[in-house]
């Protein structure tokens, strides 16, 4: 068996992944990058590489969503009804329901108002706010206290999710741009005032060691907000606070970055000034 990953075999793995309802809307760049590494690990065995690629996608994406894709159309109809009724509480309730389908935002719901109030107490009001690997974070825009002039720039590897985020922000009247972006493949040098990287670095590090700070270094923002979970998806701490804080703060010192550390709920927060 070959230890290289010829393009035709990468194509075969990609085609198998796109037939999967669970992963068919993941960015092709992400699928091909994982497929290439999987083929090398599988010594060119395509069926084995497909399994490895799906396993990789589960770790960085699938584990955070329900087994079947969320019914974004139904969630959008609920939001539409609330917006049309002009009922702010109903709008927020619809947004909370939508955010609850993604583990990352669901974990934040009990502390949602406090979370963003505390962050934006340490961050100047941005004209442009970029949210990388955004998941359903942009649906929390009403809790962020952003000005009407702020442009929310959101991206993720899931085209289906990004389509929903785009539609939801449009309904909310939030100025925005959305795109499908792979943080390890695509350009990240668009200038923005503030960038959010919420619970993203651990997923990057599972794909390529050191890539978390590579992304931070490349991102063209004077202020970056990075967060880490302090409990696993199974709600075990496993020393995560200590591990993440020691490693991250060591890297920040090497780069002479100014950081502020916060902790809200099960989330460790760093406000970085580059």
Swiss-Prot record:
EC number: 2.1.1.179
Catalysed reaction, written as an equation: guanosine(1405) in 16S rRNA + S-adenosyl-L-methionine = N(7)-methylguanosine(1405) in 16S rRNA + S-adenosyl-L-homocysteine
A molecular-function term among this protein's GO annotations: rRNA methyltransferase activity
Gene3D superfamilies attached to this UniProt entry: DNA helicase RuvA subunit, C-terminal domain, Vaccinia Virus protein VP39
InterPro entries (alphabetical): rRNA_MeTrfase, rRNA_MeTrfase_GmN_bac, SAM-dependent_MTases_sf
Keywords: Antibiotic resistance, Methyltransferase, rRNA processing, S-adenosyl-L-methionine, Transferase
Coiled-coil annotated spans: none
Binding site for S-adenosyl-L-methionine: 64, 102-104, 108, 133, 156, 182-183, 198, 207
Top-rank lineage group of the source organism: Bacteria
Any one Gene Ontology BP term: response to antibiotic
Protein role: Specifically methylates the N(7) position of guanine 1405 in 16S rRNA. Confers resistance to various aminoglycosides, including gentamicin and kanamycin.
Protein family per UniProt: Belongs to the methyltransferase superfamily. Aminoglycoside resistance family.
UniProt miscellaneous comment: Protects M.echinospora, which is an antibiotic-producing bacterium, against self-intoxication.
NCBIfam families documented for this protein: 16S_rRNA_Rmt_gen (NF000466)
Protein name from the UniProt record: 16S rRNA (guanine(1405)-N(7))-methyltransferase
Name of the gene this protein is made from: grm
């Amino acid at each position: 068996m070959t230890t290289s990953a010829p393009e035709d075999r990468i194509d075969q793995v990609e085609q198998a992944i796109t037939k999967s309802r669970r992963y068919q809307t993941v960015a092709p760049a992400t699928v091909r990058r994982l497929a290439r590494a999987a083929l090398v690990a599988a010594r060119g065995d395509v069926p084995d590489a497909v399994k490895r690629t799906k396993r990789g996608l589960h770790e960085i994406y699938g584990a955070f969503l329900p087994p079947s894709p969320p019914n974004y159309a139904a969630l959008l109809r609920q939001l539409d009804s609330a917006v049309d009724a002009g009922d702010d509480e109903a709008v927020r309730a619809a947004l909370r329901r939508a955010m609850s389908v993604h583990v990352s935002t669901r974990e934040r719901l009990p502390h949602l108002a406090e979370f963003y109030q505390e962050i934006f107490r340490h961050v100047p009001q941005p004209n442009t706010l970029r949210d990388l690997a955004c998941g359903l974070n942009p649906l929390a825009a009403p809790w962020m206290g952003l000005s009407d002039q702020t442009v929310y720039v959101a991206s993720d590897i899931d085209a289906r999710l990004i389509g929903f985020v785009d539609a939801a922000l449009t309904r909310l009247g939030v100025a925005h741009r959305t795109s499908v972006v792979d943080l390890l493949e695509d350009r990240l040098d668009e200038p923005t005032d503030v960038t959010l990287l919420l619970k993203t670095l651990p997923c990057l590090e599972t794909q390529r060691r050191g890539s978390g700070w590579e992304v931070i270094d490349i991102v063209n923002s004077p202020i970056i907000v990075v967060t880490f979970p302090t409990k696993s998806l199974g709600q075990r701490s496993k020393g995560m606070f200590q591990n993440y804080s020691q490693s991250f703060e060591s890297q920040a010192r090497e780069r002479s970055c100014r950081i502020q550390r916060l902790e809200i709920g099960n989330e460790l927060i760093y406000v970085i000034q580059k």
